[in-house]
Amino acid sequence: MMAASAAQASRQEGPGRKTAIILNRSAGSLVGQPIEETVAAIRNAFERQGAEVALSAVEPADCTGAIRKAIESDAELVIVGGGDGTIHTAVNMILPTGKILGILPLGTMNLLARDLKTPLDLEEAFEALATGEVRSIDVAEVNGKVYLNSSVLGFYPQVVQEREEKRKRHRLLKWPAMGLALVRTIRRLPLLDVRIDWGEGPRRVRTPVLVVSNNPYDGEAGSMLLRRNSLDSGKLGVYVARQRDTWGLLRLMGRTVLGTWQHDEELETLTAAQLTVHSRRHRLKMVNDGEILQMEPPLNYRIRHKALKILAPRTDGAPDGAGGGA
């Protein structure tokens, strides 16, 4: 009962307030869609719940400026439609203000939207958020840089870098470019040599991949994506692959796709409120929510418990329109 009361206390009614909506016109789900009809459908969904809506559909180069303008306006709720990169930008900008963020799943992966149980069908997503509720969720950060999903070190930053180079050079789509980059990288699998400390003293690990997630992942058989059932546990998920060869890593990747990764004895998992990664290198590369970064070690990871107010579909079974209070 105490847990239920705490959860209720962290939730508030949703729309029915001044709302700014920014759409990335080039986001995957909008390609080939009549943008005027999409804009009208979003506006109507929120205005039916009493929201005062200002909506902009902008090109990718203008997204950051549009998000900043929305945050600096008198809007209480800022809704962003785009991929994980667009969402990552919005979170870093909105977090210091205490304003509410809403996410429309318009990208390829839509990881946070999935974990918030937001429908991926656009019409359903509009309605679910328009009648939604405000929740407080955790964010993770490393050396002051905020992320919502995961921070990945090891071979993966090299894969992402190769993928982007191939997309630019050969004009490949994202997934074919990713496949080619993965094959090239894991043939000569690089190992990360670091010491990690989560409060029990530093321990050396040599691994092809180290993942630090914002809240732990849950084993979900048959799921091709890593999922989180909780976004407010106050814990980081830490995952260290013990495999040091290509075939072992491929086996782990296969189990991840099948949703059976938790049964891999060569994957070490733990949870912690904070984690420090030490290295002899001057810089370490990582991929945070799809963005490649370089940082000087030590890397200081921590969780910021319930630091972000976010609009999410209702979870209490309330009827449509219940979130529309003034």
Regions picked out by a protein language model, each given a short descriptive name:
Residues 1-77, 88, 317, 326:
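ATP/NTP phosphate-donor binding region
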Residues 80-85:
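N-terminal glycine-rich "phosphate-gripper" loop used for MgATP/nucleotide binding
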Residues 26, 40-43, 48-49, 56-58, ...:
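Catalytic core of DAGKc-family lipid kinases
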Residues 86-99:
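Short Gly/Thr/Asp-enriched flexible loops that form oxyanion-binding sites at enzyme active sites
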Residues 152, 211-227, 292:
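Glycine-rich phosphate/pyrophosphate-binding beta-alpha loops
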Residues 2-11, 198-200, 204, 230, ...:
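ATP/nucleoside-binding phosphotransfer catalytic cores, i.e., glycine-rich phosphate-binding loops
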Residues 167-176, 218-220, 227-247:
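Gly/Ser/Thr-rich active-site loops/lids in small-molecule metabolic enzymes
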